[in-house]
Amino acid sequence: MSKPILSTASVLAFERKLDPSDALMSAGAWAQRDASQEWPAVTVREKSVRGTISNRLKTKDRDPAKLDASIQSPNLQTVDVANLPSDADTLKVRFTLRVLGGAGTPSACNDAAYRDKLLQTVATYVNDQGFAELARRYAHNLANARFLWRNRVGAEAVEVRINHIRQGEVARAWRFDALAIGLRDFKADAELDALAELIASGLSGSGHVLLEVVAFARIGDGQEVFPSQELILDKGDKKGQKSKTLYSVRDAAAIHSQKIGNALRTIDTWYPDEDGLGPIAVEPYGSVTSQGKAYRQPKQKLDFYTLLDNWVLRDEAPAVEQQHYVIANLIRGGVFGEAEEK
């Protein structure tokens, strides 16, 4: 009897296994970091400004008289801003991170044969490679405070404190000088080993892992800080509308959990990096929205779907580096079922 041909499930979904909370912002003095529980929250406030015409002009608007008239017409804007108080030089950003087991186990799959083969493939990876390399890179991105994004740029000093929380108590603690840990590579660092082992144990399901992550960035009294910006889908009448809305939780400026997660999974150095870009976030097509470019095009056969199908359906295991990339996508989570042809 011939063996049935395996095909991708039309319904295939995975839950994320790195589950961060929103990150809340507070402010205080660098010398008082040990008493930061008492620091006040950074608040978001509105500011109205008069801007100047600086956008690229259409050909019909380049007449000097029209330009002068445009300049005389005020460009009024209302925006949200967030700043440290005038007597506080340090930003504190705090979030928690759950590391969940069951990586590679789909939360939804409507094809039992495909599910069995997928689990077999993931089990082979875990037995051969384990989660050590991925966990080391996730630990690296926690320790270097990549999750601060723009708030990290230009900071005089950045310290990251990570606590392993067990039954509400601190079971183990780490401190890192974030600026001493690079953003462009993942060189082996002995001080990260214990944290990486803990993350790997969480991914393998051998223990409950909840981390409290606190970063302190010394940026200067009264300096502007950068919470997440909200996407306003229904802007209605654009005239008079606020042009920038910042995210806050209970009046505290905050960074979206999705943005924290994006920073933590910025570990993909296995794509064709012809531009010297460095690590990018793990995405099925290597998408970098800030550049409008996908670095893992299907024609290169290095995108997630091609690698996964070859590995699961055809028993063509990719190179070890690309295996890490595929499993990292499963840890990321998402809906990966077979697309319907129209």
Swiss-Prot record:
Disruption phenotype: Mutants lose phage DMS3 infection-dependent inhibition of biofilm formation while there is normal biofilm formation in the absence of phage infection. Decreased production of crRNA in the presence or absence of phage. Disruption of the entire Y.pestis-subtype CRISPR region disrupts crRNA production but does not alter phage resistance (possibly OLNs PA14_33350 to PA14_33310, and the flanking CRISPR loci), indicating this CRISPR is not involved in phage resistance.
Biological processes per GO annotation: defense response to virus
One Pfam family hit: Cas_Csy3
Record bears the keyword Nuclease: no
Keyword Ligase set for record: no
Keywords: Antiviral defense
InterPro entries cross-referenced by the UniProt entry: CRISPR-assoc_prot_Csy3
Positions in coiled-coil regions: none
Top-level taxonomic group: Bacteria
CDD domains: Csy3_I-F
Miscellaneous note of the record: In this bacteria, Y.pestis-subtype CRISPRs do not confer resistance to phage DMS3 or MP22, but instead are required for DMS3 infection-dependent inhibition of biofilm formation and possibly motility.
Family: Belongs to the CRISPR-associated Csy3 family.
Function: CRISPR (clustered regularly interspaced short palindromic repeat) is an adaptive immune system that provides protection against mobile genetic elements (viruses, transposable elements and conjugative plasmids). CRISPR clusters contain sequences complementary to antecedent mobile elements and target invading nucleic acids. CRISPR clusters are transcribed and processed into CRISPR RNA (crRNA). Cas3 and Cascade participate in CRISPR interference, the third stage of CRISPR immunity (Potential). Involved in crRNA production or stability.
Quaternary data: Part of the Csy ribonucleoprotein complex with a probable stoichiometry of Csy1(1),Csy2(1),Csy3(6),Cas6/Csy4(1)-crRNA(1). A Csy3(6),Cas6/Csy4(1)-crRNA(1) subcomplex is also formed.
Protein name in the entry: CRISPR-associated protein Csy3
Organism: Pseudomonas aeruginosa (strain UCBPP-PA14)
Gene behind this protein: csy3
